Design a protein with these regions (language model features):
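Bacterial N-terminal signal peptides that target proteins for export
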Residues: 1-9
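Bacterial N-terminal signal peptides
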Residues: 8-18
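Short active-site neighborhood of thiol/selenol oxidoreductases, capturing the structured segment around
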Residues: 55-77
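Hydrophobic beta-strand anchors of alpha/beta hydrolase catalytic cores
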Residues: 65-66, 97, 144
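Thiol/disulfide oxidoreductase modules built on the thioredoxin-like
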Residues: 116-120, 127-173
Length: 176
């Protein structure tokens, strides 16, 4: 009798807790880490195209999405086409989306990757893997840093994400 009562009580508590957790509003976006306190981003230089040096200061005033990737990274191969489609969306035309290859690949190898995966809306950027890894505390690829209009990191995505996920799109528009 006690066992039956305990099983019934467990089921009731489970059902109540499940309904409560669904009623709390929070983003359910896999791999998104939202910072409680915004972090000021330091200016750093990297290379655009084959040889043009640029810095994060070149991209002020608009939301900034920095995606760190490499040609040899399997999740990056899956993620990059959705990042490219994100840049093509009208709501994101004013966003600066910067994919920086920090895998030690040359511009030519990055260009070949972009051609192979039909990446048409993004530019090619390259940077020093160790320097960026240390500055941004990157522990794996892909890693995406989300920076608001004021130059503060408000969150990051660690690992693969589908940039066409509607809940992510809504969060980006609201918070960057």
């Amino acid at each position: 009798m006690k066992t039956f009562f305990l099983k019934k009580l467990t089921i009731i508590l489970y059902l109540i807790s499940s309904s409560v957790s669904y009623s709390i509003e929070r983003p359910e976006i896999k791999n998104l880490i939202i910072h409680k306190d915004k972090k000021k981003i330091e200016n750093i230089e990297f290379t655009k195209s084959e040889a043009q040096k640029v810095s994060l200061n070149n991209f002020k005033q608009n939301p900034l999405i920095i995606n760190f990737w490499a040609t040899w990274c399997a999740p990056c191969k899956k993620e990059m086409p959705s990042l490219d489609r994100l840049k093509a969306l009208n709501d994101f035309k004013n966003f600066n989306i910067i994919p920086i290859n920090i895998g030690g690949d040359s511009y030519e190898k990055s260009k070949k990757f972009f051609d192979e995966f039909k990446i048409e809306n993004l530019e090619i950027f390259t940077g020093s893997g160790p320097e960026f890894s240390q500055l941004f505390k990157i522990r794996g690829l892909p890693t995406t840093i989300l920076i608001d209009r004021n130059g503060f990191e408000v969150g990051r995505i660690v690992g693969y994400i589908d940039f066409n996920d509607q809940s992510l799109l809504d969060w980006l528009l609201k918070n960057l």
